[in-house]
Amino acid sequence: MTSNDGDRSNGDDDGRPHGDRAVLALAREDWRTAADAYVQAAFATFAGYEGFGYGAFGDRTEVGVAVAHLCRASVCHRLADATGRAQNRAAQGALVAADAREHVATERVDEGACEELVGVCRVLADDPDAATAAFDRARDAYADADVADPAGATTRPVHQAGTDLLTHLSRPDDVAWDDVHGTGGDALARRVRFLRSKLPEFVDARVRDGKLHAARASTEYNTGYRCPACDATDVNYHSPAVLCLRCSAVVEAR
């Protein structure tokens, strides 16, 4: 069987977690390998073999992380000119998020977070009408939940996974928590509005630029490191490597 987005990866994962291999593939701009690694990271996280080991179905569910990895895989497939596979990964993510809404979430506020992820996946699947409907359901779920501390609710596991995905897809523009949620008492409602208006722009920008940067981790500026690709001295510390904060090239392997 042949593929339209590059050679088949060789399966040599050198013992690293799949998520780490995805980061290294992003640094090499090897989008096919990054997509495959993110898919493997998604299902390993879902099963409880990666991440914090909680899996999808417990009280501290990591289902949001798994769906976010499928979304990252979708973007990488787009960068590899594999639109069909990109849509497939997004559709998988939407199914997982919808299942979590029905069978994992126990509070209305968490149902809203699952609906957000459905909306993100539908954006990536080129289905704007379904995305709009999902974001509407998320908005309504948050209104029904009427949580006392909307800003605090954004740290719940599925919400945090969604925030991490959004900030990742925003790079190199690097939107911050305040950009997404504001400083008032309507953090959840504002979050949905931000997703609805900005996510398609971020996805289009990544495809137009032909690059998905590594997510922002721990960063440091004006260091003794120097990027071999762009000469920058600002770095992004990831577990598999020190990366350039500006272009995501490997500055120092680990």
Map each language-model feature to its residues.
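Domain-level recognition of nuclease-like catalytic cores that cleave nucleotide substrates
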Residues: A131-A134, A138, T154, D179, ...
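Terminal disorder- and signal-encoded targeting elements
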Residues: M1-G58, N222, C227-C230, D234-Y237, ...
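Alpha-helical protein-protein interaction scaffolds
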Residues: D14-P150
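Cys/His-clustered metal-coordination modules, chiefly Zn-binding fingers
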Residues: A161-R254
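Structural signature of alpha-solenoid helical repeat scaffolds
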Residues: F57-T61, V65, D81, V104-T106, ...
